[in-house]
Amino acid sequence: MLKAHRFIILLIVSAMSANIYAQERLLVSYAGFGGFQAPAWAAKDLGLFTKYGLNTELVMIPGSARGTQALLGGSTHFGQIDGTALIAAINQGADLVIISASLNKFPFSLVVQKNITKPADLIGKKVGIVAFGGAHEVSMVLALKEWNIPRQSVTLLASGPAANRFVALSSGGLDATLLAPPETGEASRLGLPTLAHMTDLKAAAFPMNVIATRRSFREKNRDIVKRFLQAYAEATYQFMTNKNKALPIYNQWMKQKNPAVIEETYEYFAAIFSFPPRVSHDGMRLAMEMIAQRSPGVRLDTNIDKYVDERVLDELEREGLFKRISGRS
């Protein structure tokens, strides 16, 4: 009888613990209002975090460096950011780990003034990027290298969010800037040409949208991490394949009311998101190579396992989650 009572008590305690975890508010950061932020938005708006028993709040933290700092400081539990600052921080011993990725390509296009018609015209010009140390800088450095343009011959300016850069470009304050849908469509309607798409670079693989968390949080809260990745994977797939669900999400989060712009943005990103949401190792190697070039005095550990841990994704794949989500089971 005593054993039965103990068993019942254990069940109650376990249920209470699960409920506490379900009710704990998890803060999830995203990096801006570009269309490539959609997987985090979809997980929230489609009720998938709730479906998997998570109470989440999304917070916007622009730039990978700030997003990384928020994770390190415990201000957020998960971050949807690009991998550059994460790799640099982890290499220096930060308690962080990348657990998933929904976008493994640069989503940007280089939009320019009308007098710039070829890459060589960028020499001596001002190019706006969101900030140094992230995907914008990496993609521009790669593009200049591919075009045989010396890095020092082009001025890169940290110019803030896309809306700021768009205004600066349209008013002549910048000669060029990197934009993603929906701003690329708006620029085209203003007659500003696109010089190049970063997805067309020879070295286009890049950890653009990764999910990171503290390694210690992952070890202590594996069940939460698993349920988070279940929601994130399902959100990514639903967004990619269900336009009727996806368009209202863009309408809400991008503050964009032009139906044509919203649809253009959806068509662009639905085709390049990654499902299953795994990290491209080629992209990681490229990011590490660029970090090493930018900081030659830093000894960089090139073992991808130091930065990426997809064991929970492996478990979900063995359990058939991705097949069930995509209807292939």
Tell where the protein language model's regions lie, with residue ranges:
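Pocket-lining segment of extracytoplasmic ligand-binding domains
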Residues: 84-85, 163-256
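Bacterial N-terminal signal peptides that target proteins for export
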Residues: 1-8, 21
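Secondary-structure end/capping motifs
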Residues: 219-300
